[in-house]
Structure formats: C-alpha cells, structure tokens
Amino acid sequence: ASHWKFTEDPAVLDLEGAFTEIPIASMNYSPLFFWKLFVLGRLNPVKHKPIGNGLPAKGGGSKKELLTRSHHLCVSADGYFSTQLNRALRKTQQANDPFLVVIGHPKALTQFGFKTLESFIAQHHRNHEFVTLSSVL
C-alpha cells in the first residue's frame, strides 16, 4: 500500500487511525557517491550551497564512514542526492512498486538540486504522476 492509517504502532493497520504512514523510498549509496558529493561541493560551492539560512541537524555518521562504506538512506531531492532519482525510479519499477516517495528538506535544497529535480520531472512527467504530500492525505 502507498500509505495506511495507524493509532499507536505504525506497523499495525487501523483504518480509523489518527496517523498516516507513508513509506519513504530508500536505497544504498556507495562511498563513491559521497566522494563525488564532497568534491563537487568544494569545486563549485555556490551551486551546492543550501539556499535557506538554516543548518541541517548533525547526522550520526562521520565523514570517514561516509567515504569508506555504503549507507542505506532515504531517496532525497536534496542537493547532490537528486542525482540518484533516476536510479531510484528504475529500482522502484524493477520491484513493480507503483509508488516512489522522495523527500526533501528546505534547509538542504540547493540550486544544483533544484535543477536536477526539474530535469527529472521534465523527463518523466508524461509517464508518471507527481503529487505532493497534501494531495495524498
């Protein structure tokens, strides 16, 4: 299911539940992905600088961990992560899943991410429906 209702435990369906669970897509990101992310951010900081004036929360992993081992993370439209949207869509289609839920956060959006997301939507809008969270609930 693309989403379901629950009351206390998101793993227990409750058709009358007050809360809605919407599973976010996830996939593996290799160390090479993070090397590219860090290098491109250093080579062209204006393009990869977050647009907002906020700061994202510190993650649990160190840069060393990101650069040396794969990580299973959510599919995101933020910054350089947006370069993986086509791969996420292929993975979703191969799994015969009708939904690809992508997240983004205003504190992490960049000019690069906006352009990549815009290209992704332009490339796929004829064959896929793009919706917002508010239109699903």
Predicted feature descriptions by range:
Residues 1-3, 130-135:
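His/Asp/Glu-enriched short active-site or ligand-binding loop at hydrolase and phosphoryl-transfer sites
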Residues 1-93:
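Active-site-adjacent pocket scaffolds in enzyme catalytic domains
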Residues 22, 102, 132:
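Conserved, mostly hydrophobic/aromatic
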Residues 25-29, 105-109, 135-136:
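Active-site beta-loop-alpha junctions enriched in small/polar residues
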Residues 34-36, 114, 136:
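Generic alpha-helix signal with a bias toward terminal, lower-confidence helices
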Residues 63-64, 76-124:
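Extended, basic/helix-rich recognition subdomains
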Residues 126-128:
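Non-catalytic interaction surface on structured domains
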